[in-house]
C-alpha cells in the first residue's frame, strides 16, 4: 500500500485528530507541532505563544481509498477558517487554520479548495487559512496522541 501524508492545523489538535482518524482510508494520525521556530517544542512551549508553532495533525492515508480532495473537504467542514488564530474559545497562534502541503499537487489542490470555499458563500467573512510548505513535524507528547479516544470521548467538550 502506497500512502501519502497530509498535515493540518484547525484548532485544538485533539478533536481534529479524532475527526481524521475515523475516516476510511486513513491509516494513521499523529498530533504534533509545526511551523514554528523552536526545535522539538513541548506543549508548554507551544502554548506560550512564543514559538510560532501550530497544533497540527499529520494524517497518513491511502489515496486509492480516500483522496486528498476528500480530506480537504473534511478539513473545511470541521473548523471555522475565518477566525485568525482562534477556534471557539481557544485563542493563540497555535490554533490557526493552516494547510501544510507535502507536494506541488497538494499545494495546487489546497489553493483551489480555499478559493472554492471562499467563493461558495458558506462563510460571510474572509477565509484566513494559511497554505504553506510542510515544515518539520514535531510529534507531541504521548499523552496527546489519540487523546479523546483514550477518554471515551468523540469531541472536545469545553
Where are these regions (language model features)?
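Flexible coil/turn and secondary-structure edge motifs
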Residues: 1-158
Amino acid at each position: 500500500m502506497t500512502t501519502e501524508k497530509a498535515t493540518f492545523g484547525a484548532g485544538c489538535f485533539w478533536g481534529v485528530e479524532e475527526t481524521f482518524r475515523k475516516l476510511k482510508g486513513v491509516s494513521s494520525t499523529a498530533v504534533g507541532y509545526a511551523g514554528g521556530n523552536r526545535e522539538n517544542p513541548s506543549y508548554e512551549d507551544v502554548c506560550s505563544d512564543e514559538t510560532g508553532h501550530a497544533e497540527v495533525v499529520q494524517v497518513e492515508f491511502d489515496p486509492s481509498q480516500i483522496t486528498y480532495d476528500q480530506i480537504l473537504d473534511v478539513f473545511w467542514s470541521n473548523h471555522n477558517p475565518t477566525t485568525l488564530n482562534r477556534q471557539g474559545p481557544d485563542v493563540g497562534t497555535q490554533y490557526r487554520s493552516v494547510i501544510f502541503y507535502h507536494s506541488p499537487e497538494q499545494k495546487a489542490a489546497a489553493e483551489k479548495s480555499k478559493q472554492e470555499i471562499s467563493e461558495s458563500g458558506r462563510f460571510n467573512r474572509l477565509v484566513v487559512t494559511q497554505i504553506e510548505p510542510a515544515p518539520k513535524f514535531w510529534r507531541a507528547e504521548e499523552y496527546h496522541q489519540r487523546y479523546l479516544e483514550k477518554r471515551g470521548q468523540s469531541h472536545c467538550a469545553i
